[in-house]
Amino acid sequence: MKSRDFLKFYNILQNMGSRYFFFRAKYELERKTGILKKKFIVNPTIRQFISLVEWKRTAFPFFFHDRNDLHLSKQSNLVLEQEVKQIITGSIPYFSATWIQLGLDYDWITNPDTGYQYDVSKHWTEVEDIDLKAGDIKYVWEKSRFSFLYPVMRLDAHEQQDHSDFVFGQILDWIAKNPVNCGPNYKCSQEISLRVLNWIFALYFYRNSNRLTEAVFQKIIHSIFWQ
């Protein structure tokens, strides 16, 4: 073991305690030996778990049944309208502070701060989350959390608009450009949890939208299952 690696593990033990230390050591061992790569497969077989009709009929209670359950004031909000206008034209609020224009054809794997593009053909276990050349990986994770969907849904709820085409379009674009278990967006389970929660929120909100077809639903459910 290199002295640098030894120091890293020593610092983890000192700062996080023995329980996390052994968890981390096991994780690194499985990552470097390829065990995790075998556990988290790529190109999984397409399966149908539940149909859209069945889901609508039997879905577990969520925060709400669909958008009609949200009894919000039906009034214009110019600030919210401007925010959504920026979002649907490719600009995203980063870390609830800085707006960055990514464009409408963003690849979901390029760090807008450094311009570094991750290799989406690599298994996530081969992607380094700390890389000076790549920069802070959270710049890639930020849009992939899909928290930018909430202002869009808020506007739809307040003003009786329907941006389901944009919302499902963004989700399907992510799925198409992020093969299962490949690239930086599968690296962190916390990021995955946030993304899945936000997708499910959108599914419930737009559950009766014409844009939510059987094909769209199956693609989203398949991706959720394998994340």
Q: What are the language-model segments listed below?
A:
Residues 120, 127-130, 134-227:
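Aromatic-lined, polymer-binding surfaces characteristic
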Residues 2, 11-18, 22, 69-81, ...:
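Intrinsic-disorder-associated interaction segments
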Residues 79-125:
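Low-complexity, Ser/Thr/Pro/Gly-enriched N-terminal "stalk/linker" regions
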Residues 5-8, 79, 83, 166, ...:
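Exposed alpha-helical structural elements
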Residues 25, 98, 186-189:
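Short coil/turn segments at secondary-structure boundaries
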Residues 54-69, 74, 78-80, 93, ...:
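Eukaryotic compositionally biased low-complexity/IDR segments
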